[in-house]
Amino acid sequence: MSAFIVLGAQWGDEGKGKMTDYLAENADVVVRFQGGNNAGHTVVVGEKEYKLHLIPSGILYNDKLNVIGNGVVLDPKALFEEINYLESLGVEITPDRLIISDRAHVIMPYHRILDGIKERARGNKDIGTTGKGIGPSYTDKMERSGIRVCDLIHKEVFEENLKETLEVKNKIITEIFGGRALDYNEIYNEYLGYAEKLRPFVKDISVIVNKKIKDGKEVLFEGAQGTLLDIDYGTYPYVTSSSTIAGGVCIGAGVGPTAITNAVGIAKAYTTRVGKGPFPTELLDSTGDWVREKGHEFGVTTGRARRCGWLDLVILKTSARISGLTSFAVTKIDTLAGLDTLKVCTGYRLNGEIIDYVPASLEDLAKCEPIYEEFEGWDDSIANARCYEDLPENAIKYLKKIEDFTETKVSIVSVGPKRDQTMMISEI
């Protein structure tokens, strides 16, 4: 393969960081194409644990080029905090190993302020934002009032853009929400400092990535969040502000669709989501609590407890269709060891009709009753399994059901957080 995508097939938190790290071993380039520092990836290498938010997971290898694409919204403060964190763990970050799109939009202090103010104003209709300014930054991008990285590193352009934009933002903050105005000089001086630190990393990434593909290099596109958080195909409005599906790669990294050869959907062996919104297979009982504790289901970025439920094959089938997935990588199947019986959702009953897709309307999704098929569980710990044949027979049946229902093969199975707790069972 030459260019392939790794993306979340559920509501995020599926283990994309680990899978990207695993697959990056054979890649030359790793590209983040959307989202911002609202994403959280945990990668375990040996005895070390790394928590990443902005920087691609390929940074943990010494010989990979890592790319932050134009579809990402970049918080310079968060970026340099992450760089310092990684360097403290012995990871070298240089312009030879990390490049940033000159077209990426910059998260400004007023984005974070407005994110928090608007969320509080929603009251009990809050959408569960991380408060990091992601949504407001994408809003400015679409309103054509955003500041891009190429603007930030040109002093005169940045000065003019900041003056115009801050005047409007301060009116919104003070006159509509009753907040305190932000100081122009304080922001200007802070971000000029970031501009100089960013400058060596800034490139036209579309030119570089396409040349790598043309030269036959292996390019891995790393998604953040998940399919059901996509701005168009997710459970709107409880979604993120970017395109998390395969189509987002073309926009967020400047490559054409014909360049993509494979798309791998990462899916937990059960389902989780953070925040509000319908969740047909949610477990609101002791089983849900058990899965949450055993699976350590707490957000990397927010620390929030994740809602847990049975595996929903309707969601996986929807993800496979929308992104043209060529295979699934199933993670955390080890978490399910010890349950006598497992349930898998194979359809929804909505207004007397059985459907096998996720409806657009939240009201309809909230009415959906899951139709379950039961499977016998397995008692054995499978954390030491290193090939398909090491898995219990019931675990293999469980994986086969995923393949049969979604008409998409399972190519990778993960049985723990470490690199070596991963088995490739077929080509992706």
Curated annotation (Swiss-Prot):
Source taxon at top rank: Bacteria
Residue sites binding substrate per the record: 300-306
Reaction equations catalysed: IMP + L-aspartate + GTP = N(6)-(1,2-dicarboxyethyl)-AMP + GDP + phosphate + 2 H(+)
EC number: 6.3.4.4
Entry's Gene Ontology molecular function annotations: adenylosuccinate synthase activity; GTP binding; magnesium ion binding
The protein, known as: Adenylosuccinate synthetase
SS bond list: none
Keywords attached to this entry: Cytoplasm, GTP-binding, Ligase, Magnesium, Metal-binding, Nucleotide-binding, Purine biosynthesis
Signal peptide per UniProt: none
Cellular component per GO, a single term: cytoplasm
Chain residues that bind IMP: 13-16, 38-41, 130, 144, 225, 240, 304
Primary subcellular site in the record, as a coarse category: cytoplasm
Species assigned in the record: Clostridium botulinum (strain Hall / ATCC 3502 / NCTC 13319 / Type A)
Assembly and interaction partners: Homodimer.
Active site: 13 (proton acceptor), 41 (proton donor)
Enzyme class (EC, first level): ligase
Binding residues for Mg(2+): 13, 40
Function as written in the Swiss-Prot or TrEMBL entry: Plays an important role in the de novo pathway of purine nucleotide biosynthesis. Catalyzes the first committed step in the biosynthesis of AMP from IMP.
Localization of this protein: Cytoplasm
Family: Belongs to the adenylosuccinate synthetase family.
Cofactor(s) needed for function: Mg(2+)
Pfam family, one: Adenylsucc_synt
Gene that encodes it: purA
NCBIfam families membership: PRK01117.1, purA
Binding site for GTP: 12-18, 40-42, 306, 332-334, 414-416
